[in-house]
């Protein structure tokens, strides 16, 4: 069987590279001898790093050829079908689905979050996904939206495949040893309202430092995340560190070792849950809020971008409460991790059914 994977691959975003790592590993486990082709921004690197075939994602002739050669086309995982990023991005990913369906390939929306979508976005998804054979989504909001748009497609709830990532060996970065514990990891990204939140995030970081935590910023989205991290560090009275992160093992290992994670990045929060680490979310996107709802997480956000003035709590107080409750929260998060791992396997169970058709 020959698979083609369409996602945000080859851009150096470690969250998406983790996603690809898990999907490729599970496909090899379930389909020995399968050929895996990945649409990538940097196909040579993707082919080398994951031992797969890779096709340049913006070479439309090559993409069309890759679709025609595939037996099964997987759109995902990730938040691909949304036009908060841009309509161009949505048209690209929806166009892959449309082309695959028209070419008679078995086509599946795989482990995605759907939306936000405006009117044009909804029409685009509705038209491009007619004839889709299978779909799994990461949260209830996405399931409801996609079922409304597609009607005749059974949309199944799952969870992000990164919940299935393996426990890493203990990671030491730049000579950091046990003296860095207790560790708090912060993963931020620039958002539309980011400038409004730098002081708020800094206040939370400073309170954690006062309580004895060692805070490190981990830019898993690359240079843009490092820039966002630096902007917050400059607003801090304490002295958090900015750590370079050049591979998924480093990111996974540090988050698994942390006592608390502060996350804008969805995959930072997913990794925290996977390894039973309490967290404070910064819900810049509905998919972050949906994840917290799905696990019944009891803590409010550290800061909510775009919230009405006066409707937010005190970030420093939120940080203090999370730190003092961290042991009890770790138990709750660990139990949620077991449920989410079962849900994440559902992506591959639905794929198995499609492969047998």
Regions found by a protein language model. Give the residues of each.
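Active-site anion-handling motifs in enzyme catalytic cores
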Residues: 1-357
């Amino acid at each position: 069987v020959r698979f083609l994977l369409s996602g945000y691959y080859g851009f150096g975003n470690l969250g998406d590279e983790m996603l690809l790592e898990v999907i490729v590993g599970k496909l090899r486990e379930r389909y020995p001898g399968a050929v895996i082709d990945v649409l990538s921004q940097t196909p040579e690197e993707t082919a080398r790093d994951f031992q797969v075939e890779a096709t340049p994602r913006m070479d439309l002739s090559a993409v069309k050829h890759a679709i025609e050669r595939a037996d099964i086309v997987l759109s995902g995982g990730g938040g691909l079908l949304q036009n908060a990023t841009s309509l161009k991005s949505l048209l690209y990913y929806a166009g892959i689905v449309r082309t695959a369906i028209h070419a008679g390939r078995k086509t599946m929306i795989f482990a995605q979050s759907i939306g936000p979508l405006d009117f044009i976005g909804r029409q685009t998804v509705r038209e491009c996904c007619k004839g889709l054979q299978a779909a799994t989504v990461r949260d209830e909001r996405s399931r409801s939206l996609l079922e409304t748009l597609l009607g005749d497609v059974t949309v199944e709830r799952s969870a992000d495949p990164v919940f299935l990532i393996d426990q890493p060996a203990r990671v030491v970065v730049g000579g950091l040893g046990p003296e860095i514990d207790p560790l708090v990891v912060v993963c931020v990204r620039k958002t539309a309202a980011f400038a409004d939140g730098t002081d708020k995030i800094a206040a939370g970081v400073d309170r954690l430092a006062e309580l004895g935590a060692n805070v490190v910023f981990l830019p898993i989205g690359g240079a843009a995340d490092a820039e966002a991290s630096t902007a917050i560090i400059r607003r801090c009275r304490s002295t958090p560190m900015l750590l370079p992160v050049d591979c998924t093992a480093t990111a996974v290992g540090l988050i698994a070792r942390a006592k608390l994670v502060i996350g804008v990045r969805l995959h930072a929060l997913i990794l925290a849950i996977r390894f039973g680490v309490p967290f404070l979310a910064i819900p810049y996107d509905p998919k972050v809020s949906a994840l917290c709802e799905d696990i019944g997480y009891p803590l409010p956000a550290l800061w909510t971008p775009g919230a009405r003035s006066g409707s937010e709590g005190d970030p420093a107080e939120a940080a203090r409460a999370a730190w003092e409750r961290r042991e009890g929260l770790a138990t709750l998060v660990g139990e949620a991790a077991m449920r989410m791992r079962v849900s994440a396997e559902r992506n591959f169970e639905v794929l198995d059914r499609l492969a047998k058709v």
